[in-house]
């Protein structure tokens, strides 16, 4: 996700400095014209605004701690990772302790929208930084929303991904049932596309699911992580989540069966 986002910034004329925990992963961005920093702090020191995209709450916290020595008053730190609200608040505290501003901006969208500059940013935190970031956000995405205090963006993203994950399990069950009924799966996709339940996700994922192919646009391990975090959020609020909880069990089973690094649509297995 971070690679196409950075490339879009470069293509729009921004000076970009990159750092990655795995140095080889930064090579495509360096080849596209970015400077390579030796450390996270060095990348922040070289940048007015730093965007961070990592895969887990633990990684997001570790990167913030590694980056803080490069932050200072006047700089901005935008974490676009999907984390829980508590982690985002902890990162905000780390960043703000340096005098820098913080914005959480988790994205709705996967690899293809990232490549196309069509992500949706769910932002919360320092509104002045949000306004400063409007141009790069528009370069990397098709929409961005300011949702208030730190934590609100994280919560919105978990709600969105919980809905997406639950929809996918229902879709997978429908495809499987149609196959067992000797119904043509391609006809099923056509019927769905013409009715009230038509969905871009179903149209995109249906053909590859029918073909048994699961190239990872959004890895299953990340979907299961987001289901877990959404269910934990609901537990805090004493909100029943029977559908999401049942869907999460299917993702956990798929992960145990070796589908962690396949697309989340591999839950159909």
In which residue ranges do the predicted regions lie?
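Helical "substrate-binding/catalytic lid" subdomain
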Residues: 152-267
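Residues in the short beta-alpha loop(s) of Rossmann-like NAD(P)-binding domains
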Residues: 21-22, 56, 126
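Rossmann-fold dinucleotide-binding core
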Residues: 77, 82-162
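Hydrophobic beta-strand scaffold residues
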Residues: 16, 36, 101-103, 144, ...
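Rossmann-fold NAD(P) dinucleotide-binding segment
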Residues: 40-101
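Hydrophobic residues within alpha-helices
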Residues: 5-9, 91, 136, 177
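NAD(P)+-binding Rossmann beta1-loop-alpha1 motif at the extreme N-terminus of oxidoreductases
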Residues: 1-52, 75, 111
